């Protein structure tokens, strides 16, 4: 049975929510307002100096020109775009293979995929760096994309998506004369669009916030990312 909350209880709940919202919003608002201050204003220890004396945009112009933000944005978006394409394509095919095709060593191979998900990504930094150094691919867009061209998480996600789909769809396609490739391309793969969208979002987020690898693989400031 639902219990009604008294008016006093609602007021307390609203006050707590307002306090939590205040704590979450104030640092973000402070950061934005500080960007419009002069250097002397931003370094003052006066907690009551919240708003700048005048809203100035010189800091934005200086940061854009000195740090070459245009090039950094281009590198970041190119890396994310390439990673999304390769991750979705490879994860889609591998996920379908692991969920539907019965081949020798499939369980062992999928176990390796799960094992890779449990290993910290920092362990792969040195081997990946040495591989790119051998082929002289450092300080390139390819070096930014390299660790995320395939995704163990993406393979696991797409496998689970195909595991939840009925086999009757494949049986019907087979009766219509479709082979395995046609069944995958024209019947099964279009039905996993929601999982692909989720994979695209995760891939973009992981790539955008990646900090360690771009610093190691690309020493040229014009070939790094926003992170």
Regions found by a protein language model. Name each.
Residues 2-227:
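A structural signal for multi-pass alpha-helical bundles of membrane permease subunits
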